[in-house]
Each structure stands twice: as structure tokens, then as C-alpha cells.
């Protein structure tokens, strides 16, 4: 699709069932290009299920349409990233995993290491390359995941309650890094959030799910 006005992501009558239960019921929404769209609603409304459908992780009915302008890359930051505290994988190795072809047991290539060091520095994690993932705080882990999800720049960024469990300072730092990652890039973003203040700070478009049905969509002013 070459129409510049076309949404980057569009769902049409998206329905997800779990047994006899309908989790998403004919949900139709569109994400304007370059926007941050907040997806809000009560627990159990199907917000995370919608992201799982977009990522192709679950079966669904209806249509999910992508109107790509570049390479169609999707970045994703989950609500939580479960790590085994005994796993020796470090922050630097985590970023290197998808940035080189050779196994990590053979070492990290010099060019990849330089790239990883740059990503860590941009995420305020300079000097953390050798720190095991299990030793990162919640805020540090979320900034690491954001750095991973936005390099290379995606066309669509999915954030599933990325600030859950973080204190106010960590939330604000995450938001600062999100703004920096999006600055001038035109990354279309879908943000799930239960924090009205965060939605007001970040979103310029809001979609409300109520009982798994889109009940309200509106534009909001950025603060």
C-alpha cells in the first residue's frame, strides 16, 4: 500500500475465542502512521490478546492488515521478561544474540560489540555489558528491551504495559527513552497502559476496549 494516509496497522472484525469464551469480539481499529495509540480498558478486556494476535502468536478470525512503507519490522516490549537468575546471559550478550550469526560461545564480533555498547549507552546502561540479566532492576530490563526492540528501527512498535511494576522514576526514564527512540523516526506505536497519566503524557490517540469490544476512540492532546 503506497497511500501515505493508510494506517500502518488495521484490524477488521478481529475475533479471538478461548473455548466457548469470546475474548475479542469483532474488534476493528486503525493505527495512524507515526502516532502513539494507547489501548486502554479493564483487565480481561483483551488488550494483550490483541497484541498476541498481531504478532501471530494465537489463532484469530477476521483480518489483520499491515500497510508497510519500509521493511515491515515489528518491535515488541512485553510487560515482563522472565529470566532465570541462574542463567549467565549478560545484557551485552542478550543484545548481541540477534545481531550476529556466529554463536556467542565463539565470542562477540568487534563491530557487533561496538553496536551493543552504543545501544547500552543510549539506554543509560553504559558499563552493563557484562552484567547478568538476572541482576538488572525492572527499569533497567525494560530499557534494555526497548533498546533491543527499536534497533534497527521498526515500523511498528508494540508495548504491552511496559511500565508495570516500575517506580515513578523508572517510568519517567523509560518514557524519556521511548521519546528519544521515536524522535524523527515515525515509528507507529501501540501502547497498552493502565496509567491515565502516562496515556496523557504519551498518546495522541486512544482506543478503549470494554468487554472485548471497541467502545471509544479519540484523539488526545500531547502534554
What are the language-model segments listed below?
Residues 40-42:
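The feature captures the beta-strand-to-loop junction immediately N-terminal to the Walker
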Residues 110-128:
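Conserved ABC ATPase "signature" region
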Residues 132-136:
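Conserved ABC ATPase signature
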Residues 157-160:
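Catalytic Walker B motif of ABC-type/P-loop ATPase nucleotide-binding domains
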Residues 168-170:
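Helix N-cap at the start of a conserved alpha-helix in ABC-type nucleotide-binding domains
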Residues 193-194:
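H-loop/switch region of ABC-family ATPase nucleotide-binding domains
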Residues 205-219:
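H-loop (His-switch) and adjacent beta-strand-loop-beta switch element
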Amino acid at each position: 500500500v503506497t497511500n501515505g494516509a493508510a494506517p500502518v496497522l488495521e484490524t477488521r472484525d478481529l475475533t479471538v475465542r478461548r473455548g466457548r469464551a469470546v475474548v475479542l469480539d469483532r474488534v476493528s481499529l486503525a493505527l495512524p502512521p507515526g502516532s502513539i495509540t494507547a489501548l486502554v480498558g479493564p483487565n480481561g478486556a483483551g488488550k494483550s490478546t490483541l497484541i498476541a494476535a498481531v504478532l501471530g502468536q494465537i489463532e484469530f478470525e477476521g483480518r489483520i492488515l499491515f500497510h508497510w512503507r519500509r521493511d515491515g519490522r515489528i518491535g515488541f516490549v512485553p510487560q515482563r521478561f522472565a529470566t532465570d537468575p541462574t542463567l549467565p546471559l549478560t545484557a551485552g550478550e542478550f543484545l548481541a544474540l540477534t545481531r550476529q550469526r556466529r554463536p556467542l560461545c565463539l565470542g562477540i564480533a568487534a563491530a557487533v560489540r561496538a553496536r551493543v555498547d552504543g545501544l547500552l549507552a543510549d539506554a543509560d546502561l553504559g558499563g552493563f555489558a557484562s552484567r547478568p540479566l538476572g541482576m538488572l532492576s525492572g527499569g533497567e530490563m525494560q530499557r534494555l528491551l526497548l533498546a533491543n526492540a527499536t534497533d534497527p528501527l521498526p515500523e511498528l512498535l508494540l508495548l504491552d504495559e511496559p511500565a508495570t511494576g516500575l517506580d515513578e522514576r523508572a517510568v519517567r526514564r523509560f518514557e524519556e527513552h521511548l521519546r528519544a527512540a521515536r524522535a524523527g523516526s515515525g515509528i507507529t506505536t501501540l501502547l497498552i497502559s493502565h496509567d491515565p497519566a502516562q496515556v496523557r503524557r504519551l498518546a495522541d490517540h486512544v482506543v478503549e476496549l470494554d468487554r472485548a469490544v471497541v467502545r471509544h476512540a479519540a484523539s488526545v492532546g500531547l502534554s
